[in-house]
């Protein structure tokens, strides 16, 4: 009985890893396709902050495919890219530059399933955290909402 339960848990873990791996492969393909397209209609919106900011929306055939935000807040710059398919965020890249700390840069990557649940997160040190059932409470993991 113990061997049977152990085998069951092992199989669930392998299936979960396989599902995440398949989704990540799909995300990378969509990401490459989005970035290879060169004829986007780009809408720019200035954000009235004390240090400034901008939102750029990239449309292909009137469908929103990518959003880039840049915000300056005191001694930092926050740059984010949201990748969108079928109206939902599937990947987010976040780069924070700290000007007061020798221009230190911190990168984070967020991967989402088809329902915008965070399934994989890569922290600034490169550590990968993944869970097919969704990850909760990761700073900066918000999806794009217009």
Language model features: what each stretch is:
Residues 4-13:
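Sec-dependent N-terminal signal peptides
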Residues 16:
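Cytochrome P450 heme-binding "Cys pocket" and the immediately downstream C-terminal segment
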Residues 19-146:
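Buried hydrophobic residues that stabilize the cores of well-folded domains
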